[in-house]
């Protein structure tokens, strides 16, 4: 906390005025540091902040984990309209820390996920990787993470032209040495998909393309079946035909005992790729492709998540609407979801459904 306080005092122009410290260290309670009083973290903390007209709370690197775990204190701070800033994780060990305002994602009470980087790297390095839905929130993060492992080539497929163009620009800027083909097409075009598989002969397929908005698919069930089911069947069949080593399909927890069209469509996809895997293992179908499925729930920041809707409702002054007050939601960050997809792709031997631990309910 001292280092952070020195930094804000030395900032030119000064962005923050140091009014005090909050600490759970009883030995320094009521002392003064750098001319500012040290307050205890207790039931009176919020009143002290209100009396001193505090508008901003800076969280030091050493206090971030405890702060994330203290849901009651977070709620009280936010209820007072106090803005929260903390250093970005990349800068915790540097002398000059860049502060950013805290988002909902930063408050998720969870340690960073670590994966077997060596195994993932050996699987992806020097290989041809095909990613569907590459311009989506999950797909685009998959592109960024996979590109770090120096694949021989990325074949990126999405039907959204402008976001796909953004991916092309991102690849050219951040990964200029990685060969990338950005293709605009629908996975439902069998002839186009066949041409792509025949031309590029991918080693691995990460299938992230899907319609995922539950209410939209309830009103458009034919599109859900066409895109999610038929599109997946086309890709899976071609993966077998053209010798793909591993096909990793991204599914959803809504496929478990599905109660809506979208969940049903994804469950059908799971069953189909598992049946293909079994047929290959039993010698009914000639092929070598291993099919692995990954399931997870709400992803913070995803285009299909409720979080963007909640943010808009909060900014508009409310109310925040939920489908049912009894609903319990679990959330995961996009980067950690994608890391787990890569981990599952590495560890899966075919036929498995990997269900991600979504942590504590929010």
Report the location of each language-model feature.
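Conserved Rossmann-fold NAD(P)-dependent oxidoreductase catalytic core, especially the SDR/UDP-sugar
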Residues: 80, 94, 201, 207, ...
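NAD(P)-dependent short-chain dehydrogenase/reductase
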Residues: 237-240, 261-354, 359-361
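Conserved Rossmann-fold cofactor-binding substructure of NAD(P)-dependent oxidoreductases
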Residues: 184-203
């Amino acid at each position: 906390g001292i280092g952070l306080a020195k930094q804000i005092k030395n900032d030119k122009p000064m962005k923050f005025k140091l009014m005090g410290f909050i600490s759970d260290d009883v030995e320094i309670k009521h002392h003064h540091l750098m001319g500012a009083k040290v307050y205890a973290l207790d039931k009176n903390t919020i009143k002290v902040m209100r009396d001193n007209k505090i508008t901003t709370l800076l969280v030091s690197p050493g206090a971030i984990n405890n702060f994330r775990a203290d849901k009651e204190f977070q709620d009280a701070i936010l209820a007072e309209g106090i803005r929260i800033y903390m250093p970005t994780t990349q800068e915790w060990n540097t002398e000059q820390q860049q502060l950013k305002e805290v988002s909902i994602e930063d408050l998720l009470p969870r340690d960073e996920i670590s994966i077997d980087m060596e195994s993932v790297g050996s699987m992806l390095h020097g290989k041809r990787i095909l990613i569907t839905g590459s311009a989506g929130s999950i797909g685009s993060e998959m592109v960024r993470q996979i590109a770090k492992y120096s694949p021989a080539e990325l074949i990126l497929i999405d039907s959204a032209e402008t976001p796909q163009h953004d991916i092309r620009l991102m690849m050219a800027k951040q990964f200029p040495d990685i060969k990338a083909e950005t293709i605009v097409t629908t996975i439902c075009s069998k002839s186009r998909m066949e041409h792509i598989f025949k031309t590029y002969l991918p080693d691995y397929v990460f299938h992230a393309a899907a319609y995922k908005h539950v209410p939209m698919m309830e009103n458009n069930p034919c599109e859900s079946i066409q895109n999610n089911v038929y599109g997946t069947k086309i890709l899976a069949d071609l993966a077998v035909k053209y010798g793909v080593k591993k096909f990793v399909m991204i599914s959803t927890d809504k496929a478990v005992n599905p109660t809506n069209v979208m969940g049903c469509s994804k469950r059908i996809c799971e069953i189909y790729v598992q049946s293909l895997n079994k047929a290959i293992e039993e010698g009914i179908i000639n092929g070598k492709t291993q099919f692995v499925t990954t399931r997870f729930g709400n992803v913070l920041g995803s285009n299909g998540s409720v979080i963007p809707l909640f943010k808009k409702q909060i900014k508009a002054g409310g109310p925040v609407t939920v489908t049912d007050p009894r609903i319990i939601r679990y959330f995961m960050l996009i980067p950690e979801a994608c890391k787990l997809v890569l981990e599952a792709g590495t560890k899966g031997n075919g036929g498995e459904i990997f269900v991600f631990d979504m942590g504590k309910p929010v």
